[in-house]
């Protein structure tokens, strides 16, 4: 079942895939990485000018990585806000997604956190560097296939 935004995008020939609705009834769309920067600008101009959150996750060990954007459009008042969830999947071998920092400035720290924890490179991000882990940290700690270097359990310390 397609939502109103999916229908609107399809009428304009914008490539996307509807993933249905989440448990709150929020429409979820999949956008290809190569289309994300242009569709982000279109969504902003259409009224989705508030980025509620951006996060990322590891879909499966050895599988894809996903960057998730929750956008809000407030046209008829706060009580009638329209929300959409955008998912951009990328291969873990070369995880690159265009940064939307230039569209929504609030993605600054959020894209940096996704880079720091999962290794997704956000192209054209002005300050893409580690934000939580030290610069010397090796690897991406939230990937499902991550093996912590020199890791031991607390019980092994005694």
Swiss-Prot record:
InterPro entries: NADH_DH_suC, NADH_quin_OxRdtase_su_C/D-like, NADH_UbQ_OxRdtase_30kDa_su, NADH_UbQ_OxRdtase_CS. NCBIfam families: PRK12494.1 (NF009141). GO terms for molecular function: NADH dehydrogenase (ubiquinone) activity; quinone binding. It is a peripheral membrane protein. NDH is composed of at least 16 different subunits, 5 of which are encoded in the nucleus. It is found in: Plastid, Chloroplast thylakoid membrane. Gene3D superfamilies: NADH:ubiquinone oxidoreductase, 30kDa subunit. This is NAD(P)H-quinone oxidoreductase subunit J, chloroplastic. The keyword Cytoplasm does not apply. Its EC number is 7.1.1.-. It catalyses: a plastoquinone + NADH + (n+1) H(+)(in) = a plastoquinol + NAD(+) + n H(+)(out); a plastoquinone + NADPH + (n+1) H(+)(in) = a plastoquinol + NADP(+) + n H(+)(out). Pfam families: Complex1_30kDa. It is an enzyme of class 7 (translocase). GO terms for biological process: photosynthesis, light reaction. Belongs to the complex I 30 kDa subunit family. One of its GO terms (cellular component) is chloroplast thylakoid membrane. Keywords: Chloroplast, Membrane, NAD, NADP, Plastid, Plastoquinone, Quinone, Thylakoid, Translocase, Transport. SUPFAM superfamilies: Nqo5-like. NDH shuttles electrons from NAD(P)H:plastoquinone, via FMN and iron-sulfur (Fe-S) centers, to quinones in the photosynthetic chain and possibly in a chloroplast respiratory chain. The immediate electron acceptor for the enzyme in this species is believed to be plastoquinone. Couples the redox reaction to proton translocation, and thus conserves the redox energy in a proton gradient.
């Amino acid at each position: 079942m397609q939502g109103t935004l999916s229908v609107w995008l399809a009428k304009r020939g914008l490539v996307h895939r509807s993933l249905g609705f989440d448990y709150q009834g929020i429409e979820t769309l999949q956008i290809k990485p190569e289309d994300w920067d242009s569709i982000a600008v279109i969504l902003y101009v259409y009224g989705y000018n508030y980025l509620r959150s951006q996060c990322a996750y590891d879909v499966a060990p050895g599988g894809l990585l996903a960057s998730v954007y929750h956008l809000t459009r407030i046209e008829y008042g706060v009580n009638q806000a329209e929300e959409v969830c955008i998912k951009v999947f990328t291969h873990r071998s070369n995880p690159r997604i265009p940064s939307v920092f230039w569209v929504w400035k609030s993605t600054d720290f959020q894209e940096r956190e996704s880079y720091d924890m999962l290794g997704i490179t956000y192209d054209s991000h002005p300050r893409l560097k580690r934000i939580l882990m030290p610069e010397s940290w090796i690897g991406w700690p939230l990937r499902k296939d991550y093996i912590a270097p020199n890791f031991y359990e607390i019980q092994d310390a005694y």
